């Protein structure tokens, strides 16, 4: 990311991000909620190979129809919309993500929990695209090459998915007469409503910034937003891994469901809270060292966005790990729909005066409202009556974060900190070392559990080596 920020600059980077935001809307439109619905359904029936094959083919057929329809719609909008003419080449190139995203069936492999395949494939594709990035992108004029690499990085691995999924589908005993596409329409549409609402407050800011303020402000906003999204991606990946297992437990073992739910809550909290604090206090160093002086306008933007790490973690916990497994996606849809409407209104109100900072503020409010409404309905409907939160463990995490905040205030305002790469690396390592030391000192359950697991593994490997 630092390399791309410095080579492309705000304007060229903004062009690619603007086109990407447009394509992401069409991806959501064509997917109609199947990526989330598919994970849940596949997780529930993965032991029944015949039903697994039938359900997978049904969902792929729906996706084929919606993808074709979306391409037709995209073609007409690109041709007729004069504001898109300067981005036609980028939109055509990046539209390949529509096909690869939908027919790659990532939801299938998440549903069967083939984590080894997902991880290896992810790492290989990331390494290839990183190498291509340094070889092909050398100047601001290379933004088309960068767009191609974004496509490969985002959905390149889906080539392999399309080949591998054939091994799981029993085609001999499957014909179109037994397929029932209609049964999936209503639940996918409910999830689709939530997905499109979330996308409004994730993508509308970029779209409106490009339309109302210009590519430069999109660049400023994208740098701050992308830095956060790397951490958020880690959080959402944990959520994606846990969703199929919790969906399975909700059907087969309620006690295990609530046990895993409590562990998941503390995992999310341990990661997201210090991340939000870190981005707030280190925003200047992060932007200047990762993007350069030309992106200094992104510093305030990153500060505003920093609490989103925590809010997204809570949204995933309440939405994906409680509401979705319990088939209460309507509550999630309503919550994010209200948030999206508020986000759109705030963007229109704040963007002209505050540009990217107005968009950041709108997104922050939207994320908060989404979590607030989810918690309100979950408590009201007593959906967590069997969830016994360990208050003492929660206090250990909150106290550790509180001490971390106080230490950073003292360091920032009373001591001089060097703003160079070495100082940044040392400060970052020290920040997280102090945090995890505090958790260990207070004997926080999650950290102690991880250390005990490592302790069991290491002696075993040592003994194996001695044999």
Residue locations for each model-derived region?
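Interhelical loop/hinge segments that connect adjacent transmembrane helices in multipass membrane
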Residues: 143-147, 159-202, 241, 245-259, ...
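Alpha-helical transmembrane segments of multi-pass membrane transport and lipid-handling proteins
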Residues: 28-31, 36, 57-89, 93, ...
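Membrane-interface helix-capping segments at transmembrane helix termini in multi-pass transporters
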Residues: 8-19, 45-57, 68-99, 139-147, ...
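Short runs within selected transmembrane alpha-helices of multi-pass transporters and secretion channels
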Residues: 1, 19-23, 27, 31-39, ...
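Helix-loop junctions and terminal segments of transmembrane helices
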Residues: 2, 31-47, 228-265, 272, ...
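Helix-terminus/linker motif at the lipid-water interface of multi-pass membrane proteins
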Residues: 1-13, 135-139, 192, 196-231, ...
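Alpha-helical transmembrane segments of polytopic membrane transporters and translocases
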Residues: 2-3, 14-31, 190, 205-207, ...
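Membrane-proximal transmembrane or re-entrant/amphipathic helices at the cytosolic face
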Residues: 409-467
């Amino acid at each position: 990311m630092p390399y791309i920020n410095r080579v492309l600059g705000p304007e060229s980077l903004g062009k690619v991000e603007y086109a990407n935001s447009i394509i992401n809307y069409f991806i959501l439109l064509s997917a109609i909620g199947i990526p989330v619905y598919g994970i849940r359904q596949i997780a529930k029936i993965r032991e029944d190979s015949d039903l697994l094959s039938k359900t997978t083919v049904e969902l792929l057929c729906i996706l084929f129809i919606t993808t074709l329809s979306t391409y037709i719609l995209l073609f007409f909008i690109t041709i007729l919309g004069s504001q898109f003419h300067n981005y036609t080449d980028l939109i055509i190139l990046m539209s390949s993500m529509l096909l690869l995203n939908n027919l790659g069936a990532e939801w299938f492999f998440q549903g069967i929990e083939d984590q080894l395949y997902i991880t290896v494939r992810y790492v290989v594709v990331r390494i290839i695209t990183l190498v291509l990035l340094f070889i092909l992108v050398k100047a601001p004029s290379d933004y088309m090459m960068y767009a191609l690499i974004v496509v490969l990085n985002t959905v390149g691995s889906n080539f392999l998915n399309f080949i591998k999924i054939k091994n799981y589908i029993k085609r001999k005993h499957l014909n179109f007469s037994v397929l029932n596409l209609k049964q999936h329409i209503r639940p996918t549409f409910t999830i689709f409503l939530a997905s499109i609402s979330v996308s409004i407050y994730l993508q509308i800011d970029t779209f409106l910034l490009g339309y109302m303020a210009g590519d430069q402000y999109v660049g400023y906003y994208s740098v701050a937003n992308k830095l956060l999204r790397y951490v958020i991606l880690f959080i959402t990946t944990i959520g994606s891994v846990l969703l199929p297992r919790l969906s399975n437990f909700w059907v087969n073992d309620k006690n295990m469901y609530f046990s895993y739910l409590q562990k998941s809550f503390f995992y999310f909290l341990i990661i997201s809270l210090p991340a939000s604090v870190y981005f707030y206090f280190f925003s200047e160093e992060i932007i200047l060292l990762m993007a350069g002086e030309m992106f200094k306008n992104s510093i305030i933007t990153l500060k505003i966005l920093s609490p989103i790490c925590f809010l997204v973690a809570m949204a995933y916990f309440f939405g994906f790990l409680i509401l979705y497994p319990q088939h209460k996606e309507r509550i999630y849809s309503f919550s994010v729909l209200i948030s999206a409407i508020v986000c759109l209104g705030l963007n229109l109100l704040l963007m002209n005066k505050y540009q990217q900072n107005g968009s950041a503020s709108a997104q922050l409010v939207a994320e908060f409202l989404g979590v607030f409404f989810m918690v309100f309905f979950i408590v009201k409907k007593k959906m967590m009556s069997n969830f016994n939160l360990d208050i003492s463990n929660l206090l250990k995490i909150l106290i550790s974060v509180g001490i971390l905040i106080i230490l950073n205030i003292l360091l920032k305002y009373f001591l001089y900190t060097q703003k160079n790469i070495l100082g940044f690396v040392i400060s970052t390592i020290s920040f997280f070392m102090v945090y995890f030391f505090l958790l260990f000192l207070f004997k926080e359950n999650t950290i102690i559990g991880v250390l005990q697991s490592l302790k069991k593994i290491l002696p075993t490997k040592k003994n194996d080596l001695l044999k």
